[in-house]
Regions:
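Catalytic phosphate/metal-binding cores of nucleic-acid and nucleotide-processing enzymes, i.e., regions
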Residues: 1-173
């Protein structure tokens, strides 16, 4: 289980955000929506490879295509490489604000709804229970994350790692 939430057997692809060696992603870098993901492990085969890149809201857009009489959910990236199987996208991350550490997960594809959750913070700076229908789900979460913070707290927010999981749709969340 990944953070006790995502069964590993459902994971098709796992990506990690690229960052310079030894550095962390800042709030502004994440908020800009220009994160690039590198594939960590190919856990099982998909008919069409997903490119390891997320630009703006391209990856995470939900579309329904007809495959014969059956409707199939597809996810596509900026290059329109299709994944013709029903999948879910999950963002998983670790972050630190000053001395407070936490981690969270976010289901970026759920019939247009975003579900997010964070835990592990003791100082009350972050409380995340956001529900929305923005396909830029992770960027939206980060934007909402900043609401209870002042500028100094936002500048102190660092993401140790951000990972993206492409999972089969039977993930329990």
């Amino acid at each position: 289980m990944i953070y006790g939430r995502i069964p590993e057997e459902t994971v098709l692809y796992r990506f990690t955000a690229q960052m310079p060696e030894g550095s962390k992603l800042s709030y502004n870098e994440v908020r800009s929506g220009r994160m690039h993901f590198r594939k960590v492990a190919k856990i099982s085969h998909l008919h069409h490879a997903i490119a390891a890149k997320w630009v703006g809201g391209s990856l995470g857009t939900r579309t329904v295509m007809k495959k014969g009489k059956k409707k199939v959910d597809v996810v596509y990236n900026a290059g329109d490489k299709m994944v013709s199987e029903p999948v879910e996208l999950w963002f998983v991350w670790k972050f630190k604000i000053n001395n407070a550490k936490g981690h969270g997960r976010l289901k970026a594809l759920d019939s247009g709804n975003c579900q997010s959750m964070s835990k592990g913070l003791e100082d009350g700076l972050v409380r995340c229970g956001m529900m929305g229908n923005d396909t830029n789900a992770f960027v939206t979460w980060v934007a909402n994350l900043s609401l209870p913070m002042d500028k100094k707290q936002r500048e102190a927010l660092k993401f140790d790692e951000v990972e993206l999981f492409v999972c089969k749709t039977n993930v329990k969340g």
